[in-house]
Amino acid sequence: MDWLTKYWWILVLVFLVGVLLNVIKDLKRIDHKKFLANKPELPPHRDFNDKWDDEDDWPKKDQPKK
């Protein structure tokens, strides 16, 4: 078990290389042209800031000062 305390980082590197190889293998399986041909339409962006903007507390420029 002495070797494990000295060379634990090699096991971590082997694990990371295995993860990287599996990711590359899975990404090669994806057909991006087929996905782009059949991609769903995105719904319009809903912005709820319009209600917040109506409650503006800044003074209007054309109003006289009180």
From Swiss-Prot:
Basic and acidic residues bias locations: 42-51
GO CC term (a single one): plasma membrane
Keywords on record: Cell membrane, Membrane, Transmembrane, Transmembrane helix
Membrane topology of this protein: Single-pass membrane protein
InterPro entries in alphabetical order: UPF0370
Superkingdom of origin: Bacteria
Bilayer-spanning residue ranges: 4-24
Main location: membrane
Annotated localization: Cell membrane
Region feature (Disordered): 39-66
Family affiliation: Belongs to the UPF0370 family.
NCBIfam families on file: PRK13664.1 (NF010185)
Protein name from the UniProt record: UPF0370 protein YpfN
